[in-house]
Swiss-Prot record:
It comes from Pseudomonas aeruginosa (strain ATCC 15692 / DSM 22644 / CIP 104116 / JCM 14847 / LMG 12228 / 1C / PRS 101 / PAO1). GO terms for biological process: positive regulation of DNA-templated transcription; quorum sensing. One of its GO terms (molecular function) is transcription cis-regulatory region binding. SUPFAM superfamilies: Homeodomain-like (SSF46689). The keyword Cytoplasm does not apply. Transcriptional regulator involved in both the repression (at least 99 genes, such as mexR and algU) and in the activation (at least 203 genes, such as mvfR, rsaL, vqsR and rpoS) of regulatory or putative regulatory proteins which are implicated in quorum sensing, virulence and multidrug resistance. Disulfide bonds: none annotated. One of its GO terms (cellular component) is protein-DNA complex. This is HTH-type transcriptional regulator VqsM. Keywords: Activator, DNA-binding, Quorum sensing, Repressor, Transcription, Transcription regulation. Residues 226-323 form the HTH araC/xylS-type domain.
Length: 325
């Protein structure tokens, strides 16, 4: 079995935080945990204030998350961002136990972040850790979605710390209760499209992220079928064969067939659905000739495309186009 490399994403922000404070990085034994884990635990052990935890969180940038950061930047909407984050947390981030989405009254949702603590940490260390995660999450939201993203409220658990620093730092109403960090915002924002959305780059980033991450993301996205649908949606012209798609997914063809059968569909059915949706979009939103649309969708003959379109819609391509003009 090939062991996937776990990238040490956290080293750079920790290094920059200490550099700006003229604090030397101590040496760590080679057999210790990852360098960033060792350095972070060392920082926590220094007894810095809760405000310093908030400051450290601002040092985390999208680029510090590697190809996962690229996937976040190019995701279609906020809902997809959360799916990527949940998969990332399960595989890479040992500081966070879980990220959950909970609907609330008044058409709002809450993003709950459950935090892990080291057994030896005291209240001050726990507060520092909570503040780092709250601040880094807030910065990630602002970097991805813009400073106008409407966060309506924030909950930050307090472990005997100064409560006066939070509202000024976040410029938000902040509550202090429970055990989770909670960001609240209008539910319809889950469908908000990112200005940086790019389906092709999103799919490319996922191929670089490793098999374990993709397996977790597939679960978050609702199965292999939806993963393939998103992949096909990112392709501007003729759809690939099952063999090519299987290579992209880093699976063999037989595994893809079996997994799709378990989900009650076939690759051909998924491609057929994708062709139908793209054909309708091209006929409605462009003046591209029908024979060119047939080529784009991968049909060897225009007659085959016309026959398929009538099967899908009960209309000819001409009838369909004329009915909307």
């Amino acid at each position: 079995m090939v062991t996937e490399h776990i990238f040490d994403f956290e080293w750079r922000p920790l290094q920059n935080y200490l550099r700006d404070r003229d604090i030397a990085i101590p040496p760590f034994a080679a057999e210790q945990e990852s360098r960033s884990d060792a350095l972070y635990n060392w920082i926590v052990s220094k007894g810095y204030s809760g405000k310093e935890g908030l400051n450290l969180g601002t040092y985390y940038h999208i680029s510090d998350y590697g190809v996962i950061g690229l996937a976040l930047l190019c995701a279609e909407n906020v809902g997809d961002i959360l799916k990527v984050i949940r998969a990332y947390v399960k595989l890479f981030n040992r500081d966070i136990a879980n990220v959950g989405v909970k609907p609330r009254e008044n058409y709002e949702v809450e993003i709950h972040i459950s935090v892990n603590f080291k057994p030896e940490w005291n209240d001050a260390s726990r507060q520092f850790h909570v503040n780092v995660i709250a601040s880094a999450t807030y910065k990630l939201i602002m970097d991805l979605l813009g400073n106008d993203f409407p966060i309506s409220a924030l909950t930050v658990p307090v472990h005997g710390a100064d409560k006066t620093i939070y509202e000024g730092f976040f410029s938000l109403p902040v509550k202090h209760e429970g055990n989770d960090i909670i960001f609240s915002f209008p539910a319809h924002q889950l469908n908000r499209t990112l200005a940086t959305a790019n389906p092709a780059v999103f799919q490319s980033a996922l191929t670089m992220a490793g098999e374990s991450f993709n397996a977790l993301l597939e679960v978050e996205m609702g199965g292999l079928r939806q993963r393939i649908e998103l992949f096909l949606d990112s392709i501007p012209d003729q759809y690939p064969s099952l063999v090519t798609t299987a290579k992209y997914l880093r699976m063999n063809e037989r595994t893809v067939r079996r997994r799709l059968a378990d989900e009650g569909c076939t690759y051909r059915q998924i491609v057929d659905k994708a062709r139908k949706e793209r054909a309708i979009a091209l006929l409605l939103n462009s003046s591209i000739p029908v024979d060119r649309i047939s080529d784009i969708l991968g049909y060897s003959e225009t007659a085959s495309f016309r026959h398929a379109f009538r099967r899908w819609t009960g209309q000819s391509t001409t009838e369909f186009r004329n009915s909307f003009h």
